[in-house]
A protein has these predicted regions:
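Substrate-binding clefts and catalytic carboxylate motifs of secreted carbohydrate-active enzymes
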Residues: 36-40, 63, 101-185
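Intrinsically disordered, low-complexity acidic/polar segments
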Residues: 49, 97, 141-142
Length: 185
């Protein structure tokens, strides 16, 4: 995975956006011959983007990436906020298997689960491979470290409870005919 360290990039600032465009182009040129890279992901969790600057930057980055390396798919934004993408990736930290299963259902004519539902300037799902590229987040650490830690769904009481919750999440993905991949974080 060729992914940028772009988390919290303020895409609304012209200088930041133009700097990112130049830096990302250099990354793609540098790494395009690495056989272990299967896709490009220039953005991660670009929650603050507005309809003008964000859409323009994502389209520019997508098109430049494709021009430099037309052999690989481009996932415009990990965690949704898609503008133009070859892979539809979302983040889903739901801890309850039944709720997660319900969220993953794709009904004819309806949008699948997505992180950003309220932004009408974003792309509409068009059947791209659908991945949950961040899930899990189950808190599990030594007793002495728990005070300053966090996670989703509360601390499991023991290792068996941890694995049961994790198994429920994974089973929800495996049982979904639409999920083509997932990544624990």
């Amino acid at each position: 995975w060729g992914e940028s360290a772009s988390w919290m990039l303020d895409v609304n600032k012209e200088l930041a956006a133009r700097n990112f465009l130049g830096e990302w182009s250099e990354v793609v040129v540098r790494d395009r011959n690495h056989p272990s890279l299967v896709t490009w992901t220039p953005f991660n969790e670009t929650w603050g983007g507005g309809p003008d600057a964000y859409v323009r930057l994502v389209r520019d980055v997508y098109n430049i990436t494709k021009a430099i390396d037309p052999t690989r798919p481009v996932n415009d934004a990990s965690g949704d906020n898609h503008v133009i993408t070859d892979i539809w990736r979302v983040h889903n930290y739901e801890q309850d298997r039944a709720k997660l299963t319900e969220q993953l259902k794709m009904e004819e004519g309806k949008e699948p689960y997505r992180n950003a539902r309220d932004k009408d300037f974003l792309a509409v799902y068009e059947g791209q491979p659908y991945m949950v590229d961040e899930f899990g987040g189950i808190p599990w650490m030594a007793e002495k470290d728990r005070k300053n830690s966090w996670g989703y769904g509360g601390m499991p009481e023991n290792a068996e409870a941890f694995y049961k919750r994790l198994e429920g999440q994974i089973d929800a993905f495996i049982d979904s005919p639409h999920v083509t991949g997932f990544c624990y974080t």
